[in-house]
Amino acid sequence: MQCDVQGIPMYYETAGEGRPFLMLHGGYIDHRHMAHDLEPIFANHPGWKRFYPDLPGHGRTPAPDWLTNQDQVLEIVLGFIDRVIVGSRVVVAGVSRGGYLARGVLAKRSESVDGVLLVTPARHGNAGRVEDNPHNVVLVRDDSLLSNMSPVEKALLPGYVVQNQKAVQGIRRNLLALELTDQAFQKRIMSDYEFSFDVDQLPSSFERPALIVAGRQDALFGYLESWKMMAQFPRATFAVLDRAGHYLPTEQSDLLHTLASEWLQRVESYPAEVDHTA
């Protein structure tokens, strides 16, 4: 499906029916990794309509030359919400760069968001410079896999803390999306990455259920930057997963699904938990 947002034909797919749930994918890839990583949690949580857009410059959504900074990308995301999720409250999930955009949505529209899931989130402007970032480590390695991997696949493997068959499968899934990414757009956005406003300062605390999941061995962002968000999320669970780097959804998929399922249960029960007469 497509919808026009500021002249950009936004490609998106949906799954299920019910309350709106917006999925924001990471940089350089597309909506397919979000569907693969998070769809399993809905087996036990019917009643949600998932929206999986390809963000500008990714997948099947183009990025016009005038799109040069993250504020503009956020406006596109907000426009997508206005066009497709019309007048409804929404739950938002974001992985990596998508997590940064999800925080932007909260900064602008927290009053209409019922819950938020952030996986390996942080400011990309801090990538590789955060003091708590561990060095690249490999905790599980299966060298027998190398004989069946292409040079491109081998080049991507060092980003994984757990280098097993699941990692290879994850690389192969994402290669198709990597081939579609608009490299000129990526250069523009990475040169002016952070929002013009302080995403760490929400207008008020986000009082609804949240889940923040970080990788203990994430050499790109670390985990302490994510911990610093907790003051803004009084209803958040914060989890740091061992045997997980920046590709946590692949390396610790089962644990992520368990945590996300529990969080979604809290989102579903939230109205009943709150005494609105107090």
Each PLM stretch: what is its role?
Residues 94, 98, 102:
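Gly/Ala-rich beta-loop-alpha elbow adjacent to hydrolase catalytic centers
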Residues 244-253, 257:
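Catalytic histidine-centered segment of alpha/beta-hydrolase-like enzymes
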Residues 103, 107, 113-146:
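Flexible "cap/lid" loop of the alpha/beta hydrolase fold
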Residues 231-247:
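Catalytic histidine neighborhood in serine/cysteine hydrolases
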Residues 187-231, 240:
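Conserved serine/cysteine hydrolase catalytic core
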Residues 8-62:
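Conserved HGGG/HGGXW glycine-rich cap/lid loop of the alpha/beta-hydrolase fold
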Residues 49-93, 258:
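Active-site loop/oxyanion-hole signature of alpha/beta-hydrolase fold enzymes
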Residues 127-129, 147-204:
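Conserved alpha/beta-hydrolase catalytic His-Asp/Glu region
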